Swiss-Prot record:
Compartmental location: Nucleus
Gene3D superfamilies: 3.60.21.10
UniProt KW rRNA-binding keyword: no
Protein name: Lariat debranching enzyme
Amino acid sequence: MKVAVAGCCHGALDKMYETLELLQRRHNVRPDLLLCCGDFQAVRNEADLRCMAVPAKYRHMQTFYRYYSGEKKAPVLTVFIGGNHEASNHLQELPYGGWVAPNIYYLGYAGVVRFRGVRIGGISGIFKSHDYRKGHFECPPYNQQTIRSAYHVRNIEVFKLKQLKHPMDIFMSHDWPQSIYHYGNKKQLLKMKSFFRQEVESNTLGSPAASELLQHLKPNYWFSAHLHVKFAAFMQHETKSKEELPKATKFLALDKCLPHRDFLQIIDIEHDPTAGDSLEYDAEWIAVLKATNSLINVTQSSWSVPENNGLHAKWDYSATEEAIKEVLEELNHNLKIPCNFTLTTTCYDPSKPQKNMEPVHTINPQTTEFCAQFGLTDINDRIQQVKEEGSVRGEYEEEEEEMDSSGSAEEPSEYNTDNSGLSSINPDEIMLDDEGGDEDLSTCSVDPSPDHPPEFSASFSDIRIMPDSMAVSSDDAMDSTNEELEKSGVNKQVEEKSLNERPLKRVGGSENGNSGIKIKRRNQAIYAAEDEDEAK
C-alpha cells in the first residue's frame, strides 16, 4: 500500500491534504494512509492556542478546527504523534490515543496500532533528561514550566515499548534517535545544517531514549521530523546470535510544511491484502498496557525502571501469549478501533472570537471508554483525584520555587545530559522559516484562504514518489550507505533514478503575489546551540 509520511505539519492541514490531492491529479496516486511525525497542532479554539509552547505572536489558529467541527473531513486516514509544539491540553485528553477528529487518529503518549496488517508504533514529545523520570503530572491551566514539560518524553512510555517482542513495521518519533546521523550522509547533513556539527561530532544530537527504542524494536522503517531537514539513513542492526536473522532499519526524517521544503514522501509498504481498511488495535500493545497499569505515576516524583538487579520483585512486563489471547477474546477477535470521536469543547468561530477563553482539564469520553474496556487507569482522572486531595498543588508550588530557567527542577536521569538537539531558550524564538537568509524581516506569510483554494498547477512543484524499496540515501549518498543498500537487496538503479527526480515540495504563491514565509530569527547565530524546546 502507499503511505504518505509528513514532517512537522504545524497545523497546515489544508495544505497537507491539498498536496495529496495534487498527487492524485498529477500522478494518479492516492495514498492509503498519512503518517505525521509531530508538531501536528490539533488546535480547536483560542484556549488550545494558549496551551501551545510558542511565543504568543506566533500562535495562529490554522485550519485543524475545521476538521474538528466537522466542516471538513480528512480525505485520507491520518495517524500522528505529538511533538513539542502542540495543543497539549487537547492531546492530554487522549493519553492512550484516540480520534482528534473524524479520520484523524493520535497515537497517545506512546502507542501501537495496525492498518491493513502493517504494525505502526510511535512515541510523542521530545527528550529532556530533567523530566524523563517524572510522571505525567501536568494539567491545564499550564504555567511557563508545565507548558513545556507536558510534552517531554517519560521513561514509563519507553519502558512499555521495550516490552514489545513482535516485529514492528513502522515507528515514529518527533526527535531523531541519537547517533542515527552516523548511518547516513553526514557530510550533506552538516552542509545543510552546519550548526549541528558540534553535537553530531560529540554524538549528543537527538534522543537517547529514541535510540534505545531503535535498538530494541528494530523496525523496518523509522520516521522523524523536528530538525527541519530531510535526512535518510540505513542502519544494519547487530545480531545477538548466529540463529538470529539480520535486521535493518530505513530511517527518514522530513522537513516542515513550508514552500520549497521536503516535507512529504510517498513510499510503498507491503501489507496484508486480506486485511480490512479500518484502523485496528494491536493486541500485544494492549496486553502490555494492562500489565504495566500498576506502574502509572501522576506526580513529579522520579520513577525507576524495574530491572533484574535484586531491587524489584518483577521486571519483565512483556505480554505472554496467554495475555494476548485474553485481549483477543475480550474483543471477540474484532480489533477494529471504534469511531467514537466526540466534541469535548467549543470550536473556534471566526465571527465570534473568544480571546480570553481559558483551558480546562477535560476527561475525554474516548479515554473513559478505552480504560473501561481494558481495565486501565485513566491518567487524567487520577490527576483530578490527586488535585482534589490537594497533594499535587502543594508539591507543585514548592517545586516551582526551586525550578531553574531550564524549565524544570533537575533530577537524576538514566542519561547524563540533555541530548535533544539544537535550539533556543529565548522566549521570542521564531519557529517559522528559520533559514531564509537575509530576507526582508517585514515579510509575513499569508495562508491561502480556505474559501479560495490556490490553483494547484501554480502552487506546487513536481512530486516525488518513492519506488517499492525506499531510497534511504540523499542525492550524493555515502558509498558505505549504498553498499548497505545493495546488501539489503535494494534496487540501486531504481533508487538513483528516483533520487534524480524533484522531491515533493510546496511552492508558495498567493493572489497578491506574495512569496512564502521568509522570516529570519533575530540574532540567529546566538540561538544556534541552545535549548531545544522553542526552536523546532
